[in-house]
């Protein structure tokens, strides 16, 4: 049986990267929450 997690940096960044978050209103809310919480990393992208 094939494992469900098949890592790809490109897919990861397109779904969860900084620019993907900034592209939508809700994504920007995610970043705002994470900034307010004091997260060291806002998104998975470098």
UniProtKB/Swiss-Prot annotation:
A GO BP entry: cytoplasmic translation
Signal peptide annotation: none
GO molecular function, one term: structural constituent of ribosome
Entry keywords, A to Z: Ribonucleoprotein, Ribosomal protein
CC terms in the record's Gene Ontology section: cytoplasm; cytosolic large ribosomal subunit
PROSITE patterns referenced in this protein's UniProt entry, alphabetically: RIBOSOMAL_L34
InterPro entries for this protein: Ribosomal_bL34 (IPR000271), Ribosomal_bL34_CS (IPR020939)
Highest taxon in the source lineage: Bacteria
Presence of keyword Ribosomal protein: yes
Assigned protein family: Belongs to the bacterial ribosomal protein bL34 family.
Known partners and oligomeric status: Part of the 50S ribosomal subunit.
Descriptive protein name: Large ribosomal subunit protein bL34
Organism: Escherichia coli (strain K12)
């Amino acid at each position: 049986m094939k494992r469900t997690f098949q890592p790809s940096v490109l897919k990861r960044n397109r779904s969860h990267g900084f620019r993907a978050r900034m592209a939508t209103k809700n994504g920007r809310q995610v970043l705002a929450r994470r900034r307010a919480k004091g997260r060291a990393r806002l998104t998975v992208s470098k």
